[in-house]
């Protein structure tokens, strides 16, 4: 009987063991390929966002300076003035590596950073903060889980230091992913219990396996590579060969005029037809009760700021506007929006994060927005005028002065004068 079972299952067990050993001992050294790295940088797929190997390979390339552009769905709005297009066309000293997906916000970005801490050390980054992230209930758990994986988990556990940031991150992880793997260890961190030697040895073992698994399977990941042609290459042909903001503006403005012809809100035709037109009447005043002043996202943002401080990262923060015509139609209160922006800015500036490009009042400018909340055309051009000088003239990170009160529920729910917050 045992012999018969072995004849059936033995080859499967041996094959499984061989695969495990292959992955466990697979080398993590990376061979750089500029063409592949450029394609992964603008792929904007879920894989390029949450998996380790592609982004680490690009960000560690000694010959090309890829810069992380953290955000959410705005990364996916391409046109002739998109930063990835301009950097390629005019052969700038850097190339954006786009790290964003619809529904992603600071918590996903924090866990994704754990996979590439050496590549962030002493570097510059671009971080887009959308006030829309700061909803009352914060993240949709399904969206968070979609962009989270085991490699992020073991990277976090491996690098955590038992401080307040680690405790908060563990607590939020349990809220967003109650059945997360290694839940007992995450619960220990959330409870401020010290991990045992055995715990740390297991974390180290699994982290090593996950890192090598990412290296092994990452070499086969080509999904999204074709996006380079439609995201970047097709726009290179329409831009002037000699760099000139005025000449670029003329080109993208003509494109915007052509592609916003079917509505009065200055939105891209396709977006308006697909997302707005059929529900236009129902959307009238649909956002009158929205508020972004009370949200766990403020605490999640503090996680990112803490990581930037630890890694001596020098970021520039971008705060986008809402399409003004859409804001008025949907009833979104501008005073609330500006109060949200002031709260975000206070959290940044009071801790030493002073590189901020605030476009929150520019949503009424022609061709500034692609749709309701995303930059496009002249909005991207304004973005570039702020970001390019920052990245083209690198400076070290300043000295930050972190305030752990920004992890508190008091701050997350505070809607008063920020200068009076204690």
Residue ranges and their predicted role:
Residues 25-47:
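Alpha-helical transmembrane signal-anchor/signal-peptide segments
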């Amino acid at each position: 009987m045992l012999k018969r079972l072995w004849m059936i299952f033995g080859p499967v067990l041996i094959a499984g063991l061989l695969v495990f050993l292959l992955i466990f001992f697979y080398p993590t050294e990376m061979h750089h390929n500029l063409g592949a790295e450029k394609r992964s940088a603008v792929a904007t797929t879920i894989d390029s966002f949450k998996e380790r190997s592609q982004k680490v390979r690009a960000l560690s390339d000694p010959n090309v300076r890829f810069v992380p552009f953290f955000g959410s769905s705005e990364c996916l709005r391409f046109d002739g003035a998109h930063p990835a297009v301009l950097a390629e066309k005019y052969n700038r000293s850097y190339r954006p590596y786009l790290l964003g997906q619809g529904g992603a916000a600071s918590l996903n970005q924090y866990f994704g950073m754990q996979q590439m801490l050496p590549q962030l050390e002493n570097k510059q980054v671009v971080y887009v903060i959308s006030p829309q992230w700061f909803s009352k209930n914060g993240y949709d758990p399904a969206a968070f889980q979609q962009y989270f994986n085991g490699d992020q988990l073991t990277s976090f556990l491996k690098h955590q230091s038992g401080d307040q940031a680690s405790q908060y991150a563990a607590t939020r992880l349990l809220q967003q992913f109650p059945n997360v793997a290694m839940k007992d260890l995450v619960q220990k961190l959330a409870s401020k219990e010290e991990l045992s030697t055995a715990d740390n040895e297991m974390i180290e073992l699994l982290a090593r396996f996950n890192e090598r698994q990412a290296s092994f399977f990452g070499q086969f990941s080509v999904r999204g590579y074709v996006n380079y042609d439609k995201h970047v290459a097709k726009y290179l042909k329409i831009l002037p060969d000699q760099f000139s903001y005025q000449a670029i503006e003329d080109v993208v403005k003509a494109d915007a005029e052509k592609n916003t012809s079917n509505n009065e809100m200055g939105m891209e035709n396709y977006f308006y037809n697909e997302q707005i037109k059929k529900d236009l009447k129902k959307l009238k005043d649909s956002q009158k009760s929205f508020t972004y002043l009370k949200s766990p996202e403020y605490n999640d943002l503090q996680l990112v700021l803490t990581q930037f401080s630890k890694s001596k990262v020098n970021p520039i923060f971008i705060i986008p506007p809402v399409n003004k015509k859409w804001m008025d139609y949907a009833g979104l209160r501008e005073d609330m929006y500006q109060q949200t922006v002031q709260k975000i800015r206070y959290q940044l500036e009071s801790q030493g994060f002073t590189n901020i490009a605030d476009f929150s009042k520019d949503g009424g400018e022609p061709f500034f927005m692609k749709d309701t909340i995303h930059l496009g055309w002249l909005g991207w051009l304004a973005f570039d005028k702020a970001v390019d000088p920052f990245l083209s003239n690198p400076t070290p990170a300043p000295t930050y002065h972190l305030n752990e009160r920004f992890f508190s529920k008091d701050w997350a729910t505070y809607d008063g004068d920020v200068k009076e917050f204690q």
